[in-house]
Amino acid sequence: MLRNCAMRLRTLGATPARRPGAARRLFSSEKVIRKDYALPNPSWTKDLRLLFDQFMKKCEDGSWKRMPSHRQNPTRAIQEFQTLFVDSKFKKEEQMSKAQQFTRSFEEGLGFEYAMFYNKVEKRTVSLFQGGLHLQGVPGFVHGGAIATIIDVTTGTCAISEGVAMTANLNITYKKPIPLLSVVVVNSQLQKIEGRKLFVSCTIQSIDEKTLYTEATALFIKLDPEKPLT
């Protein structure tokens, strides 16, 4: 899955994001402020808010960093990625400017509600995830494809800390179904690097760590600017 590599690479060294709010334009600088969807909203349950606050405490000493998350890619990031990796005959800048991140394309509370935190020293990324009602598979439970998506997003953040990368393989073992609207912890860690190959492990557990819902391993490949994707 192609992800917003350029934006996330900047984010790993970025300053904390602003509080949520509709995108607006500042008259002084004409700079657009985009809404950060990785901050609490009214659809978040008490459990998700509590976990979020706990991880924000961990961020205070600098060991963890909260990852901002936006609905649309910055235009500059799109242009940079296409310049490096996309053949000119496939570039559609006007259409791409209207593209949205899949996990942030749902109405509030209906899809992927999550906040992501990154630890550079431990090479870990943790997502606090609440699956909304429009992610249903078997009645009452989160669809397996939605679970795979949040795994891909979380492990991908681990991988791109080492450079622009794309998913090559996801190996997922579903152990227990995840109830809709429940809160789970998606914990991923970069295990090893072999050349351009990045190997990442991942688990999904209940917030009390007593239930293991899913185990996964992922392989990502660092992209070579000398080799276009198309």
Curated annotation (Swiss-Prot):
Sites of N6-succinyllysine modification: K46, K57, K89, K98, K197
Cellular location(s): Cell membrane; Cell projection, Ruffle membrane; Cytoplasm; Mitochondrion
Presequence boundaries: 1-27
Record Pfam families: 4HBT
Cell membrane among keywords: yes
Entry annotation: catalytic residues: D152
Phosphoserine: residues carrying this PTM: S28, S29
GO molecular function: long-chain fatty acyl-CoA hydrolase activity
GO CC annotations on file: cytosol; mitochondrial inner membrane; mitochondrial intermembrane space; mitochondrion; ruffle membrane
Subunit-level organization: Homodimer and homotetramer. Interacts with AKT1 in the cytosol. (Microbial infection) Interacts with V-AKT from AKT8 murine leukemia virus.
Described purpose of this protein according to its UniProt entry: Has acyl-CoA thioesterase activity towards medium and long-chain (C14 to C18) fatty acyl-CoA substrates, and probably plays a role in mitochondrial fatty acid metabolism. Plays a role in the apoptotic process, possibly via its regulation of AKT1 activity.
Protein name (record): Acyl-coenzyme A thioesterase THEM4
